[in-house]
Regions:
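Extracellular/periplasmic periplasmic-binding protein-like sensory domains
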Residues: 160, 258-332, 343, 404-413
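Segments of small-molecule ligand-sensing domains
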Residues: 315-325, 339-404
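Extracytoplasmic ligand/sensor domains, especially the bilobed periplasmic-binding protein
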Residues: 103-217, 266-292
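Beta-alpha junction/loop-to-helix N-cap segments that form part of ligand/metal-binding clefts
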Residues: 26, 40-47, 62-146, 158, ...
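Short, low-complexity disordered leader/linker segments with a strong preference
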Residues: 1-30, 98-100, 417
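Extracytoplasmic "Venus flytrap"
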Residues: 32-50, 76-83, 87, 110-112, ...
């Protein structure tokens, strides 16, 4: 009798135990993350990815054809946002993640557009699926996929891109600012990198055609620490919109000088210094009235979808800081989208996961997530029910980031100095 009972208990143990621990004991799915970790768009992406992985693993992992497997994150520093670092260094990191770290998928970067474009050939060579989640605003990325699908079908982007940002988000918003200010004048200050030159160049042409006065157009090398000469020119021009497009931390200096010089133009654009929740304190309130496009909802507080504040609170609790800027919510969301695709594919085989990703249709932190099946670019919208929605916020006293655009998710209105 005793032997019989022991036998039954052993059988039950074999049947029950795997269901409880299978994800931990199974071979992990390795996510390789090439990120510029010393910069905002690198570390916030890393935190977003790790938060999602922790949540998914705590729930049992990923169901791959009936077997639960955990995600494992491997982050390596590409240094591609640092001045003077060659693209080749980022490529070496991507290759190392694939060959040495045995990454099953690449998520995150490279972050700089030039590096990500160069990495596309590596991803194609090794047939490795990549989902860009941060940086890389150049429209060349998804256009290249559409032009040569068979070669670049492994490349996806789950975040916004410059052409859509400019034409469908920033230009309409600049027009609203012009109407509010009562002046159709703009002064441009851009970083000397591909996405900033392209983005501001397109905006300049569009606004000129709309009859706006372009009072100046200044380009600054990455790492510039003095913007006073350009700001003095802007001050001389009078009221208007100060369009700033910079992803470097030194843009903090620009905002401080803007306030010190009392430039009457209101800052708006894609501005690294404005994004972070600590910007108000770091600049002594110099960011007041400044506005930035953080590309995706969830990078500033709003009720875009039921996911948005759930993510916002979870990130804040996990990292002790609110979501910090562009790349945060999209990096978090990419892990859930990848999980969903793997589970529908029932395998890690690239061709089947690609087809599953192309069929993605799920609500997320910043709206409905779908990919264009030809270009693998996430489909944008101004309504989160229809697609991936952006978020433009303004710093307002006493130190809050207030989402002011688009109207579908806005929690406040633009205030003028």
């Amino acid at each position: 009798m005793k032997k019989g009972m022991i036998g039954i208990l052993l059988v039950l143990a074999v049947l029950v135990a795997p269901g409880a621990s299978q994800a931990k004991g199974s071979k992990p799915i390795v996510i390789g993350c090439p990120l510029s970790t010393a910069f905002l768009y690198g570390w916030d992406a890393e935190r977003g990815i790790k938060l999602a992985v922790e949540e998914i693993n705590a729930q049992g992992g990923v169901n791959v054809g009936g077997v639960k497997r955990p995600f494992k994150v491997v982050v390596m520093d590409t240094r591609d946002l640092e001045p003077g670092v060659p693209v080749s260094e980022a490529l070496m990191v991507v290759e190392k993640l694939i060959l040495e770290k045995k990454a099953d998928f690449i998520l995150g970067g490279p972050v700089r557009s030039e590096a990500a474009l160069a990495a596309m050939d590596l991803l194609a060579r090794y047939k490795k699926i990549s989902i860009l989640t941060t940086g890389v605003l150049t429209p060349k990325y998804h256009r290249r996929v559409a032009e040569n699908y068979n070669k670049y079908k492994y490349c996806f982007r789950i975040t916004n891109e410059a052409a859509n940002m400019v034409k469908n988000e920033m230009v309409p918003f600049i027009e609203q600012l012009g109407a509010k200010c009562g002046v159709h004048r703009m002064f441009v200050m851009a970083q000397d990198v591909a996405h900033a030159r392209a983005g501001t160049g397109i905006i300049k042409k569009i606004m000129e055609k709309k009859g706006w006065e372009i009072a100046g157009y200044e380009i600054y090398p990455t790492g510039t620490t003095d913007y006073s000469q350009g700001l003095l020119k802007a001050k001389k021009a009078g009221k208007g919109v100060l369009l700033v497009w910079m992803d470097m931390p030194e843009s903090t200096i620009l905002l401080k000088q803007w306030r010190e010089l009392r430039v009457p133009m209101i800052p708006f654009g894609f501005i690294c210094a404005v994004e972070q929740p600590g910007s108000w304190k770091a600049t002594g309130g110099a960011v007041e009235y400044a506005m930035t496009d953080v590309c995706n909802a969830g990078n500033a507080p709003s009720e875009a979808t039921p996911w948005t504040m759930k993510f916002y609170r979870a990130y804040t609790k996990r990292w002790g800081v609110e979501p910090e800027g562009y790349g945060t919510s999209s990096s978090y969301m990419a892990v859930y989208v990848l999980k969903d695709a793997i589970e529908r594919a029932g395998t890690l085989k690239a061709d089947k996961v690609i087809k599953a990703l192309e069929a993605t249709d799920m609500m997320g932190v910043y709206g409905r997530i779908r990919f264009d099946p030809k270009s693998h670019q996430v489909i944008p919208a101004l309504d989160p029910k229809e697609g991936a929605v952006t978020s433009i916020f303004q710093w307002q006293a006493p130190g809050k980031r207030v989402v002011v655009y688009p109207a579908s998710i806005a929690v406040g209105e633009v205030k003028l100095p």
